[in-house]
């Protein structure tokens, strides 16, 4: 259902934006099992409104807001039920409830919108969910909600709520039942814990209760006020942050280090590749250098650079600078000179400490250089060695570090001495880092972690183990063992290169900088104490450390801060706290924060913000805490205050509206590529793909042999492509479709940042330069290289293929088939028609049979239109005799002079008439409309299009189509009552019109203009399905638009010419083909529960299959999957069913533009004996389709009567219909535009079962259409599930044997 609006209003149109269903399922085929139940109660006699309806609106808006926060989408959909309200069949009424919430709307507007949806829902709920879904394919999608919201007013004496909640919950991952008893609301939830963790659900229910109480106590002004945290949520957060107000006072790390010099002078301080020092030795050497620095003019507030590789001397230099009262900045030699120069200028650096071997490059920094000598270690102390640390103040800088800036230039962060010290002892206690620890210092000096670990180790008396760069690159494990390292900190990417069983000395490992996945935990959990570490350059000594005990949930938590408190605020408004469970930006409150950014007051003010008002009210006056906006998006995940990191602000990984855990995908990929050095997954926006179009891409860095490379990318070999396709197929079995990468790309090298992290942005940018086709080509079968056309036919064919497939002609090889370059059966028909329009003949069968485009071009011959033109002269008209017979016995409803043409209705037309198929297409028109001109356009359409003037007559047991010379133009105007939503009112008008029985012996086409204002109309076109199909809707819209704008379109072929051509194709050879095709066969029939009622029902499903193998169309794959389902369900090795196919491939010029019903049902037969693999089945069906193309216009009744041994009237039991035409057309009406809203269809149930499928960008929607009570509900749902699973398996593993295919339908 939709909120009152128009298609231009973002609240409207069932499919104007992708629905984000909540909760997301572990995989597409997962069936929820709601086994857990929980309840919370809201008890406040003063807040409940006096009327039920107003309370219902509040409940619905509150639940919508919760879902909006969970999905990060303003538009939500859920199932809605009022306990005890029933359908016409006496079942509990459940309907979809779709609502778009806008933060700036008033709450009253939101409540009114919910009330309007409820009113609209009341008008349809009598139908029930299944019948409602049959109104249009869009409704099928809408009805696939995953959570159900129930409102129930209970008598206080009743006590059956849990049973009631259980009865509702079947099939839904989450059911929330609001039981209202007197002045108490009991909120019950039944849920599947494998889909929705209990902790997350508890937060959801608390948030729901908070919103509800806030709204009921007196609705605040705007919706955004309801999206803030409520009183109960505040109490939780205050409790979690209890202790955050504690102030340790002035604690400076340099003082802690000085204490260690005095307390343990003989303890090991540094053990490096180039030497070792005790704390006493380190103290003495650093003092001498500090004295030299003071002599050179260094003072508190000065910055001194350290231009050295990892070494014992670098540690000494760092301590010496601190002792001199100055601040240090590491200048790693591997960074570009230009960047280092910029860092020196921005800081500014007064002096650089280096070594003799680096003197030449150090001189390029344009800063005075002082060379340190290892021999100075043993020199006698001279005089003043106390340095300047005694006069340095807490507000003097301790160090500076540069991070990546959003502008592309490095951003300098300055940390004061007072900002590094608070929380150090607490951090070490939690991280098990103490005087006996030996810390392996592997992290680059460009990474803030290197500063954290060195300063904290020295402050606690640990030993810093410093390997050489060569040891880190070539033998990291050996170095850790030689130094007997017990404590390490590194990124997960680095840790994955190590073997824990070889590191018996290592006791503690902290992972930082990147997400930790399940594989990381499994790798290390039995060998070390495993932690995650969170900190930023701006956080000083405020670090968050989290102990991982073995579950994935543990690894995603950030832990608690070593000092201060964590809050989650609105990313757009940091003065607002986010509700429990909602996403927001992490704000850290602490006394240990950086001073700010160098020479960037504006950026500092945005990041280091004043304490928000709500926080000031919690803290005593004069409290020293400051606040940092981290830029990280997080959320609470349980009622214990666990915070989970989701993404960086503005760069969250989302696909199809769903947040994607990239680490989880990487975890599943890692066992598939056991020799890979790195496995990465990221979201890529391909070139020329349009705004917002993104795909998932996996990157595998492995020991590829014999491959070329382009930058970081390696060339995909045939073996790699085959492996990648197999891996993607396997991932589909364990992950939801939106988490399966579209492509796997081999890497020759992994780009890294200056800090040693994987440079994901570099990879994204590299891939974003490629088109979708170029990215997908990494996993496709080999395509031939481009070969320029040499003939007129080849050039024309390439040009038409490029136009149809939206590909550059240079990317299409003449040595590939039409299907290898992206064509399908519909494109094939369009290709044949376009080739004919250019003066060449080409049959659709040629396209299917030709192995290459070159061979297809060779089949093109000059086309002589006169050879194929169908004459309508009496002597050549196969229907002239029929016309004369009808005129001799003309029904009273017709006038002889008004009869223009007569010919038999096709089987499809007759079915549409028998089942009263009338469809409605509402166009919402915005802008200045000339109503008279629109009426004239409708008259022109009728006049120019004979099929629009057709009626249908039963004559001597046959259905005839009679074209009239003139008809009264069925056009009328209505006025929409004031205050009514235009589209809602129009849909109700359509619903009333559908109740009337149409007489098809009179024109049934209707045009209705519903006027709300001069600028706003709804234009309804009613079409009997007997005179149109989906492929010609665009042509109908073009004809109306052209006539309105006084333009002339080329004459389109008349449907009568099509009918006559079909009649001429009914040849003896056609009947012979079908006779041989059906020999010794029988229609495959599924077990029916009953003949069923006339009411149509739909059982929906969805899957995400891969593209079929080259030369196979998706329609063929769908038929193969359905054939397999029939085989498995019936046990028959010879199955027969029907398919609905377009017959626009007929050899009439311009057949694609015919307005009329150009569809037919033909038979599909599969004999499984002799078929070994899935690909055997696919190839057999594709070849069968090609052979039948010449005879596809034969009517089923004709085939049964003249080409089978079956009784007259034998019908197919099941029929497959694969819809594959474009989007909804629009009307161009001068200054106004008419956009088609969701059509309302009448669905045919002439066959017991029709399987309907239609593709979208990344999914295939399917549904079974049948009559009510033909099948048991569980059986029908099992059929569609089994079909979807079979199709995915067939296309994931086309080379697999058929006997290995298993489904759980």
Curated annotation (Swiss-Prot):
Residues 278-672 are annotated as: Adenylation. Pathway: Secondary metabolite biosynthesis. SUPFAM superfamilies: Acetyl-CoA synthetase-like, ACP-like, CoA-dependent acyltransferases. Hancockiamide D displays potent cytotoxic activity against murine myeloma NS-1 cells, suggesting a potential antitumour application. More interestingly, hancockiamide C, the likely end metabolite of the hkm pathway, shows potent Arabidopsis thaliana seed anti-germination activity, but is inactive against the monocot Eragrostis tef seed, suggesting that it could be a herbicidal lead targeting monocots. The herbicidal activity of hancockiamide C could be due to its phenylpropanoid-like structural features, which may act on the plant lignan pathways, and hence warrants further investigations. GO terms for biological process: amino acid activation for nonribosomal peptide biosynthetic process; secondary metabolite biosynthetic process. Pfam families: AMP-binding, Condensation, PP-binding. It catalyses: hancockiamide D + (E)-cinnamate + ATP = hancockiamide A + AMP + diphosphate; hancockiamide H + (E)-cinnamate + ATP = hancockiamide G + AMP + diphosphate. GO terms for cellular component: cytoplasm. Its EC number is 6.3.2.-. Keywords: Ligase, Phosphopantetheine, Phosphoprotein. Residues 926-1166 are annotated as: Condensation. The modification O-(pantetheine 4'-phosphoryl)serine is found at residue 825. NRP synthetases are composed of discrete domains (adenylation (A), thiolation (T) or peptidyl carrier protein (PCP) and condensation (C) domains) which when grouped together are referred to as a single module. Each module is responsible for the recognition (via the A domain) and incorporation of a single amino acid into the growing peptide product. Thus, an NRP synthetase is generally composed of one or more modules and can terminate in a thioesterase domain (TE) that releases the newly synthesized peptide from the enzyme. This is Nonribosomal peptide synthetase hkm11.
